[in-house]
From Swiss-Prot:
Residues 1-83 form the YcgL domain. PANTHER family: PROTEIN YCGL (PTHR38109:SF1). This is YcgL domain-containing protein XCV4171. InterPro entries: YcgL-like_sf (IPR038068), YcgL_dom (IPR027354). It comes from Xanthomonas euvesicatoria pv. vesicatoria (strain 85-10) (Xanthomonas campestris pv. vesicatoria). Gene3D superfamilies: YcgL domain. Pfam families: YcgL.
Amino acid sequence: MHAYVYKSQRKQDTFVYLATRDDFSGLPAAVQAQLAPLTFVLDVALTPERRLAQADAATVREALGKHGFYLQLPKTIVLAGECDHD
């Protein structure tokens, strides 16, 4: 299975993987509105051996098969002193 990866120009470190290149029809309108414009960055074969930087390839394949897209959000980093310890 191939995935076509697009980077959000609005939200840093946010990527959309599509099952079909340039087919944003399965992406909810609210998500498109938050992330657009999206710029194509990569065509990747999602083989079982494939390692992705921030996502599990099997999870991406499953989402592409079910929904036609996978949304990769940036990792949240909590810095010391920024969280409330009760």
